[in-house]
Amino acid sequence: MIPGEYRLREEPIVCNRQKSATKLTVVNRGDRPVQVGSHFHFFEVNSFLEFDRQAAYGKHLNIPAGTAVRFEPGDAKQVELVPFSGERRVYGLNNMVNGPLDGNGKGGVRE
């Protein structure tokens, strides 16, 4: 290997291959654009985004890390969501979960 050299695989790299994806249509009912990052708990996004929130619980956008999807006012987009992995704990964001996503009988949602 030469210093600075890199080698790429010949086959494409597919992220989240083993995860089941959920497709949802999202409409921005607000008057300002809304941008959602790759690892944001989609259930907790801006309340002006209209979609099936229960179907989005425990999931994030299936896009490359560090990227985002922008929803312009009045626009409808189809997005693909995949479940969080690892310990499946969500903290902060819009304070709707703040803890484990599974196993508390309420789906993790705070009242």
Swiss-Prot record:
Pathway connected to this protein: Nitrogen metabolism; urea degradation; CO(2) and NH(3) from urea (urease route): step 1/1
Single biological process term from Gene Ontology: urea catabolic process
Principal place of residence: cytoplasm
Annotated signal peptide: none
Record field: catalytic activity: urea + 2 H2O + H(+) = hydrogencarbonate + 2 NH4(+)
Pfam family, one: Urease_beta
EC numbers for this chain: 3.5.1.5
Keyword field contains Hydrolase: yes
Keywords: Cytoplasm, Hydrolase
Cellular compartments per GO CC: urease complex
Subcellular location: Cytoplasm
A molecular function (GO) term: urease activity
Xref: InterPro entries: Urease_beta-like, Urease_betasu_sf, Urease_subunit
Summary of subunit composition and partner proteins: Heterotrimer of UreA (gamma), UreB (beta) and UreC (alpha) subunits. Three heterotrimers associate to form the active enzyme.
UniProt cross-references to NCBIfam families, sorted A to Z: PRK13203.1, urease_beta
Protein family according to the UniProt entry: Belongs to the urease beta subunit family.
Record-given protein name: Urease subunit beta
Source organism of this protein record: Geobacillus kaustophilus (strain HTA426)
Taxonomic path: Bacteria, Bacillati, Bacillota, Bacilli, Bacillales
